[in-house]
């Protein structure tokens, strides 16, 4: 359902929130309809109505749980001077064999589909030319890729967390998110910041 809502053009936050709201409404409607047909004591009837009300939400939540960072936007403003390319809108700091870094390409692809003007680039820390080629194949043209050398200011800025996402506006590093805080609200911020 999130994919369908995303394809319609809703914000990432609404795409994540609406299915949960929808399941609650389904539960309320089902409980209202079924409550008329229950001929039991008031306590049993109330327990049954409560269970029917929360059941759709519970099932959807079991399949698609809400994680701690799903609705957060806890990016950190960048105050350090970094020696990174400034000609992109979104920089993704990654490690060559990090599974979360590789997974992040799906997120970047969704962001790029929402706003095709966004120029994203993967910077593979201490990677080889082969790592860069591997990422470039996976990225399939929606982001560029290159290797960079590790630096103390960079590691301090991203707090040693990979992947990390850096928003660049007007050649200025604005905000950094780690993988746990780069959620739908952050995605919306990135999409809306780039004209």
Locate predicted features:
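Structural motif
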Residues: 93-97, 125-128, 169, 178-180
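Thiol-based oxidoreductase modules, predominantly thioredoxin-like and allied folds used
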Residues: 117-134, 140-152
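Alpha-helical transmembrane signal-anchor/signal-peptide segments
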Residues: 66-82
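Internal/C-terminal transmembrane anchor helices
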Residues: 42-66
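Mature, folded catalytic cores of secreted/periplasmic enzymes
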Residues: 89, 108-118, 134-136, 160-162, ...
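Membrane-embedded alpha-helical segments of integral membrane proteins
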Residues: 1-36
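Thiol/disulfide oxidoreductase modules built on the thioredoxin-like
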Residues: 150-194
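Short active-site neighborhood of thiol/selenol oxidoreductases, capturing the structured segment around
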Residues: 83-102, 108, 114-117
């Amino acid at each position: 359902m999130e994919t369908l809502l995303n394809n319609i053009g809703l914000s990432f936050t609404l795409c994540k929130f609406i299915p949960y709201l929808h399941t609650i409404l389904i539960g309320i409607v089902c409980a209202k309809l079924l409550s008329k047909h229950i001929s039991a004591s008031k306590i049993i009837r109330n327990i049954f109505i409560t269970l029917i009300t929360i059941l759709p939400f519970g099932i959807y939540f079991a399949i698609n749980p809400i994680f701690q960072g799903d609705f957060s936007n806890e990016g950190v403003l960048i105050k350090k001077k970094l020696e990174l390319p400034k000609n992109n809108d979104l920089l993704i700091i990654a490690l060559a064999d990090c599974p979360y870094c590789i997974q992040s390409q799906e997120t970047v692809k969704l962001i790029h589909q929402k706003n095709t003007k966004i120029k994203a680039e993967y910077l593979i820390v201490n990677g080889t030319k082969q790592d860069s080629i591997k990422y470039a194949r996976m990225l399939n043209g929606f982001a560029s890729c290159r290797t960079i050398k590790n630096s103390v200011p960079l590691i301090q800025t991203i707090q040693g967390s990979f992947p990390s996402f850096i928003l660049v506006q007007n050649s200025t590093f604005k905000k950094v998110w780690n993988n746990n805080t780069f959620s739908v609200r952050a995605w919306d911020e990135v999409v809306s910041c780039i004209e």
